[in-house]
Amino acid sequence: MLATERLLEIEEKWAEKVHRIVVLEIDGETLQLIIYLKDGTNLRVTEEWAGAEIARYSYYWLNPANDLKVGWDNAPHYTRLENFPHHKHVGKRKNIQVSFETTLKEVMKVIFSVGY
């Protein structure tokens, strides 16, 4: 998926919950941005696509002071987790847990269910 198409999709899908979006990088199939939510938190998004499949992702949800709430990613460094490489950092970067949220849609569902 092209990053420009993905940005438009994100803007349309979550417009009512988003205060603003800051684009950090938009290049071919790579998208990096900060989504500022209306509750004062923000989500740092990085997605790298290979056609219709997401190859690499990270979604880091930060509180208004920019402290980590939850960070989801698929960096391949926790090989012993049952659903490697998918994992999340909860509260602290070293607090690693199994994650079944592997898309922005699933992450936003979690954020809007606990953060609002």
State what each model feature region is.
Residues 19, 62-66, 77, 83, ...:
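Short linear sequence elements within intrinsically disordered, low-complexity coil regions
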Residues 1-47, 51:
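Negatively charged, low-complexity tracts enriched in Asp/Glu with abundant Ser/Thr
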Residues 32-35, 60, 84, 97:
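Short alpha-helical interface elements
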Residues 91-116:
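Well-ordered alpha/beta subsegment
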Residues 70-98:
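Histidine-centered catalytic/metal-coordination loop motif
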